[in-house]
């Protein structure tokens, strides 16, 4: 190093002032002679003026026009096509060059820049490139230790010198070709501190559009240790991502160590305050922030203002993002939040495409322990164990808590492609007293097809133990979200929010929302009644309010009672492919009670707890009378025993008071719950104005009647087939000539709607499954166009027209008795307590013609071979019934009954001759039993006990053979 000390001692020996003058001129001469090559300028003239002012040398430079040059940064090649450095002054302390401050002042720097991907094949020859600012040299093949020592000494001198440099630049303008213009104002560097007053980024095409504005920047430029970056305000326009050039990244190790503090960060409508970020090698840590507010739509903050934990830690090497604190969200306007989410999803997707990595591997980002609280009166807590972001987004361990209800989802997958968005939830469950819900899979799809956008939610293997609770819970949740998240928002404001979003997204496509359900179970509970709905499949469109391709099985207390296949359901049309019903007397009672059509005798009806309204002695004698039909040896013996048993039993009965109707019948609860849900989903689902038309078509109805329906497969004793039935309901607005018209003897309310009901049944047959004789296969069969009923209702006034086709009945008394169990219900039908009655203006029933065959049960001890009161091919004719001006259906029923009795008198047994066998005295004893049963049949508390008696007949306890011959109408007195 002796030679270096000798060189440095020359100025001292020669004289400092003279040496400085000579050196200054030499520098000026050299730069003006070789400056074009050294600095890549267009002119050799570099230094315009030199001043030796006391202890400083001042070099005033000419404006420097830079030639094209390039430099590689990561996988990018930055090319400066041309540039201008204007007003460059260099102030050098010549007496203490390495201790005093060197000042560089620049008035303006203007550069035209291009960024492109680095050419990997040319990267090895960059040192020999004449366009580089680095010196030209031959390729070094041998390393000299002395040269290395010299370079290290020079490096230390340069670092020391650089630490004593002050830089002041008034303005720097960088024109990024076909992209952006960057303007940097008031740059200062001193004592390892870099400051900048403002950085602005403008659009190249429109200079008035400012995309980025950063104020008050300070950077600690320590060569060793952590660098601190302080930023006052940042304002970003999201349109900047569309103008950014493609940036090519490298996955090499990073050695950056920064502490960043930002007072306020604004991205369009997003405002983030007091943001503290650390960048340490491969980790980016959000240490703290005060709050984030998004355009009065949502406010985000930490769960604790003071905490020893960081908020978020991102590791770029392992591609992980760990949340160490819970994030609190106060959602103010859900509509604006949804719109902003859609906008920024496009921004994020565009920004992601601007950065290209050189690694061909598809790395996935893992977000761990994300916890969010949506604050409010009833907070919603969301906890996600892990979120994996790759080609798809996968959420693992999703937990949601609301009002002490916990919903757990093991796995959620989000597929976000250009033409289809899909979210699938796997293994969802909830275990709570309020809501107990399970589902194997829930899938949401958004498909954009031509001019339509389809939103579909699919439920697979959904289990809801209580449909009412589930529907009410979901309705309450939706209404809560609406009331809590969108308070006091007017319809106009909401429309404006949507319209603004449509302008931004340019999405004017029609949207459809559908729900698909597969292999799911829902349960309706009412007291001890449990009704399960097994939905094999159902496609429901909420937008058009339609359902298609629906297959449902209905189970009551674990027994299948119905199978329904529906083709289409709309607000004005229902098409049913097939309906199968499996029923026994007990199930029929429960369903009628379930629908609210019956009022129970007491609150414990389902448990069959009845008061003894039939005296025990009466019940015993009725059973004794029936038992005598087995042990009697002759007709006379039977008649005498029945006479003794039933004498004195006929007494006047008192009518029991009806109990009040159920305060909330199950069918009404279900209807109200569903209506509340659909009203919550779409604001005004129901239409107050009646639909002009409603039509129900059912291709086939199969009804299977059982004595006792069980889980095991058993054969029904009766099979009812209904083919091609339809029901039409229509409304027509009528303007009466006299709006104050009053119909005499009828209480009416003024109305202007005429309602029409039409029921058409093309085929109807009752098939006796227990009959071994093909001639007795059909218990009842109608010809084509079996039943046609048309009813018109206007102002409490009714017109009814009934027509039936000819029928053929093959009645086996054994089957008929089993049918009695279905009509002997122990309850009373609900009645309208209103003083208003329906006025029947006209009732018309066409002529009824039929053929009747009747086969009684054979007496065991009387005759096994005789037909016993059988009827063969009896032709029955009920003439046309045309009745006008009757006040109330009860009076109409009595009139029809009287008219039929005039034509067909059941007491006149002789009318059945010659179709009847064994007329007297066989029929007379049985009529006393029929009369006795008919007498007590009117008592709502006694029907169940009489039903037990009729059931005992099925077990050969006795026989009723006088049903056709005497007082048939009394059996149905309880129904008419």
Swiss-Prot record:
From what superkingdom does this record's organism come? Viruses
What is the protein's name according to its record? Uncharacterized protein R713
| Source species of the chain | Acanthamoeba polyphaga mimivirus
């Amino acid at each position: 190093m002796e030679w270096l000390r000798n060189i440095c001692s020359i100025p001292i020996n020669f004289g400092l002032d003279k040496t400085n003058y000579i050196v200054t001129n030499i520098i000026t001469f050299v730069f003006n002679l070789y400056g074009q090559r050294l600095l890549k300028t267009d002119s050799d003239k570099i230094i315009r003026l030199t001043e030796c002012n006391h202890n400083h040398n001042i070099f005033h430079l000419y404006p420097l026009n830079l030639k094209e040059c390039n430099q590689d940064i990561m996988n990018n090649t930055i090319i400066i096509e041309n540039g201008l450095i204007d007003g460059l002054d260099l102030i050098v302390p010549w007496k203490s060059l390495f201790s005093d401050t060197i000042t560089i002042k620049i008035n303006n720097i203007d550069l035209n820049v291009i960024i492109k991907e680095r050419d990997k094949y040319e990267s090895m020859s960059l040192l020999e490139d004449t366009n580089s600012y680095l010196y030209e040299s031959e390729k070094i093949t041998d390393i000299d230790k002395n040269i290395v020592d010299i370079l290290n000494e020079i490096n230390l001198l340069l670092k020391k010198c650089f630490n004593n440099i002050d830089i002041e630049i008034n303005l720097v303008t960088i024109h990024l070709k076909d992209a952006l213009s960057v303007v940097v104002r008031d740059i200062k560097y001193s004592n390892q501190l870099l400051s900048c007053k403002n950085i602005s980024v403008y659009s190249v095409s429109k200079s008035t559009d400012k995309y980025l504005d950063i104020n008050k920047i300070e950077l600690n430029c320590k060569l060793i240790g952590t660098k601190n970056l302080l930023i006052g305000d940042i304002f970003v326009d999201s349109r900047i991502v569309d103008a950014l050039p493609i940036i090519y990244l490298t996955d090499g190790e990073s050695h950056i160590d920064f502490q960043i503090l930002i007072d306020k960060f604004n991205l369009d409508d997003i405002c983030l305050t007091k943001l503290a970020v650390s960048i340490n090698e491969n980790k980016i840590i959000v240490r703290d922030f005060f709050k984030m507010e998004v355009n009065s739509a949502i406010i985000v903050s930490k769960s604790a203002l003071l905490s020893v934990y960081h908020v978020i830690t991102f590791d770029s090497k392992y591609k992980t993002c760990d949340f160490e604190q819970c994030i609190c969200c106060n959602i103010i306007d859900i509509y604006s939040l949804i719109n902003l989410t859609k906008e920024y999803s496009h921004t994020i997707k565009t920004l992601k495409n601007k950065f290209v990595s050189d690694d061909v591997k598809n790395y996935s980002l893992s977000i761990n322990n994300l916890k969010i609280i949506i604050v409010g009166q009833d907070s919603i807590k969301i906890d996600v164990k892990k979120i994996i972001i790759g080609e798809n987004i996968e959420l693992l361990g999703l937990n949601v808590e609301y009002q002490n209800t916990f919903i757990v989802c093991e796995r959620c997958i989000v597929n976000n492609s250009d033409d289809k968005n899909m979210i699938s939830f796997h293994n969802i469950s909830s275990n709570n007293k309020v809501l107990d819900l399970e589902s194997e899979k829930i899938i949401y799809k958004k498909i954009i097809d031509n001019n339509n956008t389809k939103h579909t939610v699919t439920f697979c293997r959904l289990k809801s133990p209580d449909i009412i609770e589930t529907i009410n819970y979901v309705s309450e949740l939706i209404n809560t979200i609406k009331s809590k998240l969108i308070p006091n928002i007017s319809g106009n404001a909401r429309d404006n929010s949507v319209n603004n979003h449509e302008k931004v997204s340019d999405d004017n496509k029609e949207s459809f929302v559908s729900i698909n359900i597969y292999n799911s179970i829902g349960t309706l509970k009412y007291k001890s009644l449990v009704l399960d709905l097994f939905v094999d499949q159902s496609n429901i469109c909420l937008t058009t309010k339609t359902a298609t391709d629906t297959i449902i099985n209905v189970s009551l207390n674990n027994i299948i009672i119905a199978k329904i296949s529906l083709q289409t359901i709309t607000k004005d049309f229902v098409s049913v492919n097939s309906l199968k019903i499996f029923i026994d007397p007990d199930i029929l009672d429960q369903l009628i009670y379930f629908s609210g059509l019956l009022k129970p005798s007491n609150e414990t009806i389902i448990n069959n707890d009845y008061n003894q309204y039939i005296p025990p002695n009466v019940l015993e004698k009725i059973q004794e009378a029936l038992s005598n039909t087995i042990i009697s040896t002759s007709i006379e013996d039977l008649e005498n025993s029945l006479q003794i048993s039933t004498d004195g039993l006929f007494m006047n009965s008192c009518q029991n008071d009806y109990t009040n109707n159920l305060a909330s019948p199950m069918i009404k609860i279900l209807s109200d719950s569903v209506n509340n849900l659909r009203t919550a989903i779409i604001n005004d689902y129901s239409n107050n104005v009646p639909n002009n038309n409603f039509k129900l078509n059912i291709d086939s109805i199969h009804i299977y009647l059982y004595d006792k329906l069980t889980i095991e497969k058993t054969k029904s004793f009766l099979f009812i087939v209904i083919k091609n039935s339809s029901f039409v309901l229509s409304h027509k607005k009528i303007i009466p000539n006299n709006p104050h018209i009053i119909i005499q003897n009828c209480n009416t309310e003024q109305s202007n709607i005429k309602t029409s009901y039409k029921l058409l049944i093309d085929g109807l047959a009752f098939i006796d499954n227990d009959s071994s004789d093909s001639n007795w296969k059909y218990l009842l069969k109608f010809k084509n166009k079996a039943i046609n009923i048309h009813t018109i209702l206007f102002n409490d006034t009714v017109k009814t027209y009934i027509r039936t086709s000819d029928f053929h009945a093959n009645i086996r008394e054994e089957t008929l008795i089993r049918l009695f169990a279905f009509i002997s219900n122990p309850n009373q039908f609900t009645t309208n307590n209103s003083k208003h009655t329906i006025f029947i203006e006209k009732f018309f029933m066409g002529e009824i013609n039929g053929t009747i065959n009747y086969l009684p049960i054979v007496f065991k001890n009387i005759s096994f071979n005789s037909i016993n009161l059988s009827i063969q091919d009896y032709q029955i004719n009920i003439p046309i019934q045309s009745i006008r001006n009757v006040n109330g259906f009860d009076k109409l029923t009595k009139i029809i009954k009287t008219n039929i009795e005039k034509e067909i008198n059941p007491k006149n047994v002789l009318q059945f001759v010659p179709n009847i066998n064994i007329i007297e005295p066989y029929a007379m004893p049985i009529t006393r039993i029929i009369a006795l049963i008919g007498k007590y049949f009117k008592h709502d508390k006694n029907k169940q006990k009489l039903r037990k008696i009729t059931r005992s007949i099925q077990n050969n306890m006795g026989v009723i053979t006088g049903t056709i011959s005497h007082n048939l109408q009394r059996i149905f007195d309880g129904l008419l």
